[in-house]
Amino acid sequence: MSKAHVVGLGKSGVAAARLLKREGWEVVLSDRNTSDTLLKQQQELAKEQITVELGYSLDFAGALPDLIVVSPGVPWDIPALVKARELGIETIGEMELAWRHLKSLPWVGITGTNGKTTTTALIAAIFQAAGFDAPACGNIGYAACEVALAATPPDWIIGEMSSYQIESSLTLAPHISIWTTFTPDHLARHKTLENYYDIKAKLLRQSHLQVFNGDDAYLSKIGASHWPDAYWTSVKGKDYLIGDKGFYIEDGWVVEQLQPNSSPQRIVAAEALRMVGAHNLQNLLMAVAAARLADIPPNAIDKAVREFPGVAHRLEHICTWQGIDFINDSKATNYDAAEVGLASVKSPVILIAGGEAKPGDDAAWLAKIQGQTSAVLLIGNAAPAFAQRLQEIGYSNYEIVETMEQAVRRSLDLAKHHQAPVVLLSPACASFDQYPNFEARGDHFRQLCLELVGS
């Protein structure tokens, strides 16, 4: 019996282990961590004849596995995986494993620094409104291998794909791929901007059809010279399209130009989307592009867009208390996303920011803080460094409050004092200093806000 080793006991790792077991592999699933939750998972998976090793880091002292499958959170270049590849052990990511089981189906792959979750969710909603079984998976919704485990295969697979997942997927080739934005992020893992770009570009190069956000500064700069056959989008109108085919906003409508010589066609009114911000119009254009390239009719697109509620943790309206809106933008884990968050809400804002800082250019974000906020509450490891940056630009109305509990309590007082209509959690940071992920951070913010309203 062939032996497989799955690294990482998260949702993706467990789904990969179950899929391999179903296919007849002898499976070991390992995680370097230990906890009561993981011990419980270990016991449950033992009933399925899946061995789980906790507190274990991959080594090659014993019999070598035939296959190693890596969860998205595990760096591709850790010494153990580098050695595995040197030893000739086939090493792939969980997304690649799912692709190998589902490649007979059409995929839409969505990647990008920011905007991919909203775009993925909206594409899935549109395809489902058109009558397709089209689950969102990957970095959102189901693990890709969970979709592969389903008794009945779907019609389409709508996959949000991080750079981590693309890096470990060697043959993944969606029918349609979308690149939402590109700015410095995850450089601690990918080292250089060029390497980060090349990883994401691989997904698009291996796809049949490509869609790009033409309003993104970096993507538009490399534009048609790199991607001459792609479809481009622009919220600014037809004159701003790169190339001669794509999707754009004109007179309040999403308009398609599928071929250079075809007549432009109105697809859906831009106001049908309830989500605020120019960035969400960009997301709308890319979602409509995917739908039209899959021959979905405008009436299904219109229905889905009008009913689309938005995405948790991305400018999510939690509640209104004494005329103050509390908004959860926990998914803003870098400066660009946080800048967009500030630009998308009413001002002046009481901003809650901080966490585990990432490399990047903070100048535009700081300028937005100066123009849009009445006060800034700083939490997490980044608080002292952020305070220093605010001092350097002459902004003094900040407080280091350290925890989310203190930030939410203090935000109400400050909002009343400054007559600010919005309290916004938009951290510009990863969450790992205080929370396991940005979802847990956003959930905690939501809980605290609702407790405040109920008190």
From Swiss-Prot:
Subcellular location: Cytoplasm
Entry-linked InterPro entries: Mur-like_cat_sf, Mur_ligase_C, Mur_ligase_C_dom_sf, Mur_ligase_cen, MurD
GO cellular component term, pick one: cytoplasm
Keywords: ATP-binding, Cell cycle, Cell division, Cell shape, Cell wall biogenesis/degradation, Cytoplasm, Ligase, Nucleotide-binding, Peptidoglycan synthesis
Pathway in which the depicted protein is active: Cell wall biogenesis; peptidoglycan biosynthesis
Catalytic reaction list: UDP-N-acetyl-alpha-D-muramoyl-L-alanine + D-glutamate + ATP = UDP-N-acetyl-alpha-D-muramoyl-L-alanyl-D-glutamate + ADP + phosphate + H(+)
GO molecular function: ATP binding; UDP-N-acetylmuramoylalanine-D-glutamate ligase activity
Superkingdom: Bacteria
Binding residues for ATP: 112-118
Enzyme kind, highest EC tier: ligase
Name of a matching Pfam family: Mur_ligase_C
Family in the record: Belongs to the MurCDEF family.
Record-linked PANTHER family: UDP-N-ACETYLMURAMOYLALANINE--D-GLUTAMATE LIGASE
NCBIfam families attached to this UniProt entry: murD (TIGR01087)
Its job: Cell wall formation. Catalyzes the addition of glutamate to the nucleotide precursor UDP-N-acetylmuramoyl-L-alanine (UMA).
Protein name: UDP-N-acetylmuramoylalanine--D-glutamate ligase
Organism: Trichormus variabilis (strain ATCC 29413 / PCC 7937) (Anabaena variabilis)
